[in-house]
Amino acid sequence: MTQFLPPNLLALFAPRDPIPYLPPLEKLPHEKHHNQPYCGIAPYIREFEDPRDAPPPTRAETREERMERKRREKIERRQQEVETELKMWDPHNDPNAQGDAFKTLFVARVNYDTTESKLRREFEVYGPIKRIHMVYSKRSGKPRGYAFIEYEHERDMHSAYKHADGKKIDGRRVLVDVERGRTVKGWRPRRLGGGLGGTRRGGADVNIRHSGRDDTSRYDERPGPSPLPHRDRDRDRERERRERSRERDKERERRRSRSRDRRRRSRSRDKDERRRSRERSKDKDRDRKRRSSRSRERARRERERKEELRGGGGGGGGGSGGGGGGDMAEPSEAGDGAPDDGPPGELGPEGPDGPEEKGRDRDRERRRSHRSERERRRDRDRDRDREHKRGERGSERGRDEARGGGGSGQDNGLEGLGSDGRDMYMEAEGGDGYMAPENGYLMEAAPE
């Protein structure tokens, strides 16, 4: 395509001119020739010293030997200083040590932000405090992290010594001990090689990380050897964490238990309500069945009475004339009376003492003997209620007659009858051997 371009554009694509050749300024390395070549040292061996005449070499110390030497020199120098200061140290003549040493408590590992008033509030719970002395640095004026507390009574100091060790103040657990400088013979502070704990015995292999007072009296009640203080404190912290965790678990379990109890009570209430509803429905069904059973029983007794009257009605109907008129015939206990139909004066097919009548009597006696005690009690209660209502109704009629003089016309056609007539009307039997209906029930005639 470029060959079809015009010349002015083809000139833009033309190659550059080649670089002009210039001769090198010096020869190449392989072309150089040295005028003085290297040679050996054999001519100079006779000029060396004899190795047998040389002095022995001096041995220089290594880095490890130098560090060990400096450490040893430092320990020796520190021991000399401690011995010098120990000769001058007298705790009984210390101007900073004031008050009774047997009432003074030593508190270490105090937070640098803790004030004297805070210490007083924390340690006044064990007894009245006489004086608190917090130690500060003489050069910078900053707190050193320990203090001395003097109580008014020695028993309060012992109580604080026993119970305040390990107490957390401003986020740090303090160490509580007695003042040993003036109370323990031969006691030396830590700066003079004494003190408590094993954090400055030597290297990391012999030092312990946490230290505290060696109070073996706190472990007298426990069997076996007394544990180390820092391990005991760690165990106490772990025990506290476990107790707090158990308390939280118990609280959660209590909340779940209360929730379960509420759900259980709700389910129990629903269950009781359903059971009561079922019982009510069962009671209704039972009452309905009982009413239907009573109705069937009344119908059965009515049929039996009719059958008795129909079967044994020939014995006593001859003299009555069959029609009856105004007299009300009372059936006898044996069931003899005027039959409902048939000519008067005729006896039954077998007579009053036939085998059919005797069989009916046996069946009736058997049915009566098989009646349950509950039915008899119900019948007696019903009869008693009827008698009571009948007596109340009779007394009300008597009062009405006494007030109205017999002319009020409220006796429904019975005002012409006397008390005997009304009683006879109330006691009259029906045509089927039952008393007159009252309150919807047919009463069976009482046996004479």
Swiss-Prot record:
This is U1 small nuclear ribonucleoprotein 70 kDa. The modification N-acetylthreonine is found at T2. Keywords: Acetylation, Isopeptide bond, Nucleus, Phosphoprotein, Ribonucleoprotein, RNA-binding, Ubl conjugation. The gene is Snrnp70. Its main location: nucleus. CDD domains: RRM_snRNP70 (cd12236). One of its GO terms (molecular function) is U1 snRNA binding. SMART domains: RRM. Residues 48-79, 187-439 are annotated as: Disordered. It is found in: Nucleus speckle; Nucleus, Nucleoplasm. The RRM domain mediates interaction with U1 RNA. One of its GO terms (cellular component) is spliceosomal complex. The lineage of its organism: Eukaryota, Metazoa, Chordata, Craniata, Vertebrata.
